[in-house]
A protein has these predicted regions:
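Positively charged n-region of N-terminal signal peptides that target proteins for export
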Residues: 1-6, 187
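His/acidic metal-ligating clusters that form di-metal
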Residues: 144-160, 165-204
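Structured beta-strand-rich core segments of catalytic domains in phosphoester-bond hydrolases
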Residues: 34, 80-155, 160-163, 225-249
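Alpha-helical structural signal in soluble globular domains
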Residues: 94-102, 174, 199-208
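Metal-dependent phosphoester-hydrolase catalytic domains
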Residues: 23-31, 146, 182-183, 191-259
Length: 259
C-alpha cells in the first residue's frame, strides 16, 4: 500500500511539473520574438501641447530630421492652417516640400477668433491610392489611409487628435466601426482625458480584438500624450525620443506586423 501511495505521489509531481512547463511554453508563445524586418517606423513630431509645431523651429529643421530618420509615415502635430488674405496657409506643406513627401491635413477644430484650423499634417512617401477622412464631431476628423508599412506589408494608417471631452465617445465609436486587422492608429489626446478614453475603449471594443498603448515620453507632465491603437495583428515595440529644437521632439514609434 505504501509503495502504491509513493507511486501515485510520484506521478502527481511529474504531472505538475509537465503542466508547469507547458504553461511557461504557452506564455512564451504569447509574446513572439521581435522581428525587426516586419517592423514599421512611424514618426511623431510634437511639443505635446497646444503650441504650433513651428513656433520654435524652422521647416528645414524638421524636414532634415525626417529625411535622416527611417520611417514609413510622419505625423506633424499641430501644424495649424491659417486663413490668409488670398489663401489658407498650411504650415505643414513647406515641410512636405522640403522632405519630398505627400501631405494630408487632418483637422481637429476651428478657431473663429484667430481664423485658423487647428490640426495635424501626415506625410506619406508616395502618391496615396486610398484615403478617407471620417467626421468624428463638428470639425474633428479621423484619417484612414492605405500605405505600405514595410517590406510589401500594407497597413491602414489612421490618425486623430482629441482635445475635448465631447470627442471621446464619437471617436471610440469610429474606432469600433473602422479598426480592422490592418489598422495602425497613432493619435494624440489631452493627458487629462486619457483615463476616460481608455475606459470608453474598454467598454466598447472586444478585448481580444485590439491593443491600446500610451506612448511614454520624458515629460510626464506634458499637456498631451501619444497613443497607439491596433488589432492584435500588430505589436507596439517601443519608442525612441529625440530633441529636434527646444521642446520640439521626434518620437520614433516601432510597430511590428505579426505573422
Amino acid at each position: 500500500m505504501k509503495s502504491n501511495y509513493l507511486y501515485l505521489l510520484f506521478i502527481c509531481v511529474i504531472s505538475c511539473l509537465f503542466v508547469s512547463c507547458s504553461d511557461e511554453d504557452n506564455k512564451g508563445e504569447d509574446i513572439p520574438e521581435w522581428n525587426r524586418f516586419r517592423t514599421t517606423n512611424v514618426l511623431v513630431y510634437a511639443h505635446l501641447s497646444e503650441q504650433n509645431l513651428f513656433s520654435s523651429c524652422s521647416y528645414k529643421e524638421v524636414a532634415s530630421s525626417i529625411r535622416n530618420t527611417v520611417h514609413s509615415v510622419a505625423l506633424l502635430d499641430r501644424t495649424n492652417a491659417v486663413y490668409g488674405q488670398t489663401a489658407i496657409i498650411n504650415t505643414g506643406t513647406e515641410t512636405a516640400r522640403e522632405s519630398k513627401k505627400v501631405p494630408v491635413f487632418v483637422p481637429v477644430s476651428y478657431s473663429n477668433g484667430e481664423k485658423k484650423i487647428i490640426g495635424s499634417t501626415v506625410l506619406f512617401p508616395s502618391t496615396i491610392s486610398e484615403m478617407t477622412q471620417y467626421v468624428v464631431k463638428n470639425d474633428c476628423r479621423y484619417l484612414e489611409t492605405k500605405t505600405e508599412a514595410v517590406n510589401g506589408i500594407d497597413m491602414l494608417f489612421c490618425s486623430v487628435s482629441l482635445n475635448s471631452e465631447d470627442l471621446i465617445a464619437p471617436a471610440v465609436d469610429a474606432f469600433k466601426k473602422k479598426v480592422n486587422e490592418q489598422t495602425v492608429l497613432v493619435g494624440t489626446v489631452k493627458r487629462a482625458l486619457l483615463p476616460n478614453l481608455e475606459s470608453v475603449i474598454t467598454s466598447n471594443l472586444t478585448s481580444d480584438t485590439y491593443s491600446f498603448v500610451e506612448v511614454e515620453n520624458r515629460n510626464r507632465d506634458s499637456e498631451y500624450c501619444i497613443f497607439v491603437l491596433t488589432s492584435h495583428k500588430w505589436a507596439f515595440r517601443g519608442v525612441t525620443e529625440t530633441s529636434v529644437s527646444g521642446d520640439l521632439h521626434c518620437f520614433q514609434l516601432q510597430i511590428e506586423s505579426l505573422k
